[in-house]
């Protein structure tokens, strides 16, 4: 199974400056035991690059290399955005909508998010 991780999961999962939540540890353990692949969406790099905490941003970006990226993810057009009733009032919305659209179009089987 291909599991897409939301940015709000990636940051605490890879932030070495805080104690890892047990649910995140369980996610990593079970995905490895069951041979599930954890993915990130390429647009999530934009989200992480906007992190105001420079040290955390540097750490998380360096650790993203351990995840597979969705190759050639579907890009949400303005028309599809309107048809699906999504709003994109800021950069975060754009990234979130494209992550959801990748799931919608079958680029991953499951999205893990804290939203």
Placement of each model-derived feature along the sequence:
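Residue-level signal for well-ordered alpha-helical scaffold segments within enzymatic catalytic domains
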Residues: 12, 47, 102-105
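Histidine- and aromatic-rich ligand-binding microenvironments
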Residues: 5-6, 39-42, 92-96, 115
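Nucleic acid-processing catalytic cores of prokaryotic defense/repair systems
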Residues: 47-50, 80
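Short C-terminal domain-edge/linker segments immediately following a structured domain
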Residues: 33-37, 68-73
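Active-site neighborhoods of divalent-metal-dependent phosphate/nucleic-acid chemistry enzymes
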Residues: 69-114
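Short, well-structured N-terminal submotif of metal-dependent ribonuclease cores
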Residues: 1-40, 50-59
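Amphipathic alpha-helical interface surfaces
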Residues: 44, 56-60, 95, 99
């Amino acid at each position: 199974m291909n599991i897409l991780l939301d940015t709000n999961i990636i940051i605490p999962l890879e932030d070495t400056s805080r104690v890892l939540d047990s649910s995140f540890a369980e996610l990593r353990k079970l995905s490895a035991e069951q041979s599930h692949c954890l993915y990130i969406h390429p647009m999530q790099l934009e989200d992480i690059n906007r992190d105001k905490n420079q040290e955390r941003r540097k750490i998380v970006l360096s650790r993203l290399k351990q995840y597979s990226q969705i190759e050639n993810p579907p890009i949400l057009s303005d028309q599809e955005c309107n048809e699906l009733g999504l709003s994109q009032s800021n950069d975060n919305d754009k990234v979130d909508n494209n992550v959801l659209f990748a799931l919608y179009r079958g680029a991953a089987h499951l999205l893990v998010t804290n939203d």
